[in-house]
Amino acid sequence: MRFGFIVVTLCSFSISIHGVSLLKKMDFSPPETWSVEPSDALTFGTGHAGVALSKTETVVFEHRIKPGQPTQYALMNHFWSTCTPAAEATLLVRYYVDGETTPSIEFEPPLAVGVGFDDSAAPWGTKWFGIGAGKGQGQAWFHNFKIPFQNSVRVTVQATTTPEAGGFYIILRGGLFDTDQLKIGDVALPPNARLRLEKYAGPLKPLEVLDVANIPTGNSGLLFMSTLAVNNSGVGSLNFLEGCFHMYDPPTQQFPGTLLSTGTEDYYDSGWYFNAGEFRMPVSGFTHIKVEKNLTEWSAYRFHEQDPVRFRDGFRFTWRCGDEVSKDPGVGKCYTQSGGNVVGSPTCEWVQSYAWVYVWPNKN
């Protein structure tokens, strides 16, 4: 998603003048040197309308919290942006939490909303995310993910290739909480929980196992949601959907760990290679499909708000490019690492995965 918009140029040196929030070049300075004062506002955020955006990483929002109760925490809880499809296709959004110099969250808006290949089918949405404008025109992606922090947050945007002219619009919002514990579904999270985005982009060999998420030992947490997108040049078509999801807690747990699905489409609450077509439901969605002689594209998402996937000492969440069936008829698929009968010709020439995981350090 690239932007380089020229409607208004605010790329600047100061984040605010007389209460008006301006853009500035990312400088990785510590929070205590920022021009914004610590705040105890219960609701905070910003909006930028028709601004320029370049290949330079640009701060669009920064916020600091006044010290308060030990149970106090803050959240970023709303993201929305819109622009032309050409610009959106080059955009990266980053969240730097509590003085980070490497962002724990960096996303492309469509993949954050569970959509691969910039599929602009619209409108649709759930309480967590969606797209309100698109259909090949200007797109408007949003999510309401709860991104906790205790002291500070900084949000930046950046075009990853040569920017294109046009207007970029963004709205960011958050809130401060004193005693109301953050809950994801039925799971209450501690004040020091952080949301981390684990990502992968690249090829996989047939039957290769991908760590969609890999959280080291010494950490507890909760898998919130994930997105998977796969394409190939037609070889094997959708045979990669035979791949099974597993979890390992701790990460060194022996195979098969805990089996989370009996095939890829099964994990997304479908079956038979998604024979009923695309869907976008509160828990899971099948958001893109293109199957041609020389091209296969597919993407889907799933949340774990209703069926928490928790871990207590590190975590691996894995997916395999295709799978094999044991030669023992009593075992079936998903429980054989090698030596079985491969189902079809699974081909994963390019894979992108996102896993949003809440993580907090174990108590000593």
Where are these regions (language model features)?
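Beta-strand-centric surfaces of beta-sandwich/beta-rich domains
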Residues: 18-364
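Cleavable N-terminal signal peptides of Sec/SRP-targeted secreted and luminal proteins
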Residues: 2-19
